[in-house]
């Protein structure tokens, strides 16, 4: 089986969806813009430096959503998709995903952004298989058939840095597959994904940051400049 793995932010999207969602919550009045943007910028700087504590970040990033009910949160996300994400989806990225799907490859998006933010984005790309940071949920609404609501904690292994290798390995194991059973390609922009790039058969440095570009050039990895990037 051919397996095509895609990072999301700055790889398929020219923006960071997690960061953009945080900014969006300030525009709709859920968070104080000065305080939120200061903290958001600090976390984003840590992410780019490879020093992010993802557990602390997820508590922060889900704080505004956790104060809202399920219906209000999902309504806000629908507006986020309409006003922020859909205009950012580039035809080049859609065409790249479609080329793998048309070739019969299994396509997965593997992202360090949480599932609440990213599941509708994966659907917008026509990708049904998503590995994202899974969010722990409480018992609210479960008696009525609901899935509970976000607690701010992470469920299972976060799909960040080396955790991406673990999560993809688990995905394969759940299908009675191993890495040796698949011909794997991984597209990413970030040095944070170096472990997964070193695991797959065909790493593709896509819109790479300076450090990843240097490594890709040294190792002879393919470099793909898919589109110009936003600064966030």
At which residue positions do the language-model features occur?
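C-terminal cap/substrate-recognition subdomain and adjoining C-terminal extension
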Residues: 1, 75, 82-232
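Active-site neighborhood of HAD-like aspartate-dependent phosphohydrolases
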Residues: 1-52
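Active-site phosphate-binding/coordination module
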Residues: 15-23, 70, 134, 158
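Short, compositionally biased "basic patch" segments
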Residues: 43-70, 130, 134-144
């Amino acid at each position: 089986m051919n397996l095509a793995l895609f990072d999301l932010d700055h790889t398929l999207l020219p923006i960071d969806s997690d960061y953009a969602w945080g900014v969006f919550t300030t525009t709709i009045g859920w968070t104080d813009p000065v305080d939120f943007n200061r903290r958001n910028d600090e976390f984003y700087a840590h992410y780019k430096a490879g020093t992010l504590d993802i557990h602390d970040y997820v508590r922060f990033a889900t704080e505004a959503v956790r104060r809202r009910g399920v219906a209000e949160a999902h309504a806000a996300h629908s507006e986020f998709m309409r006003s922020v994400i859909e205009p950012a989806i580039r035809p080049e990225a859609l065409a790249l995903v479609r080329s793998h799907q048309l070739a019969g490859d299994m396509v997965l998006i593997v992202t360090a952004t949480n599932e609440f933010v990213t599941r509708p984005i994966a659907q917008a790309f026509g990708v049904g298989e998503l590995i994202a940071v899974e969010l722990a949920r409480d018992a609210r609404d479960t008696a009525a058939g609901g899935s509970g609501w976000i607690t701010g904690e992470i469920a299972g292994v976060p799909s960040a840095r080396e955790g991406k290798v673990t999560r993809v390995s688990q995905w394969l194991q759940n299908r009675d597959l191993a890495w040796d059973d698949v011909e794997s390609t991984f597209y990413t922009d970030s040095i944070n994904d170096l472990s997964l790039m070193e695991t797959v058969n065909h790493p593709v440095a896509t819109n790479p940051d300076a450090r990843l570009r240097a490594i890709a050039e040294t190792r002879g990895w393919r470099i793909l400049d898919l589109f110009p990037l936003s600064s966030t």
